[in-house]
A protein has these predicted regions:
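N-terminal, helix-rich and Lys/Arg-enriched segments in bacterial and organellar proteins
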Residues: 8, 12, 32, 43, ...
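Amphipathic alpha-helical binding modules
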Residues: 68-110
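Acidic, low-complexity, intrinsically disordered interaction modules
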Residues: 28, 36-79, 83-85
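Short terminal alpha-helical segments
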Residues: 1-29
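Long, contiguous secondary-structure blocks with strong helical propensity
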Residues: 24-36, 100-104
Length: 110
């Protein structure tokens, strides 16, 4: 299992976990940012798994924002909106919307 795959799996275990401390959940957000920086290094399966976990976090946005909000003020986040996980409060209240758009891989012939 690659280092990225391990990190994706750990992230996936965290998106539904409200039993851990909010500090550990903030670590999940940092982990997701690290994965975003390496997104071009991920293979297709890793990207799909990451997308699946992202969708679960979006589904849990309200509860996770409340959980993390015990120690983190989302309104002070300076992260770009492209890193929406740092803005779960806005995701939860519908101020950030998502659109699925296809991308053609560079080595695929049309």
């Amino acid at each position: 299992m690659s280092e990225h795959s391990k990190s994706i799996e750990i992230y996936g275990q965290c998106v539904d976990d409200f039993e851990v401390s909010p500090f550990e959940s903030v670590d999940m957000l940092h982990r997701r940012s690290t994965l975003e920086k390496a997104i071009q290094e991920l293979n297709y399966e890793e990207r799909m798994k990451l997308l699946s976990y992202d969708m679960q976090l979006i589904k849990n946005a309200k509860n996770m924002a409340k959980h993390i909000g015990e120690i983190y003020d989302f309104s002070l986040s300076e992260e770009p909106l492209s890193q929406w996980w740092w803005h779960l409060d806005k995701v939860a209240n519908g101020n950030i919307s998502f659109h699925l758009s296809p991308e053609l891989e560079s080595d695929v012939a049309i």
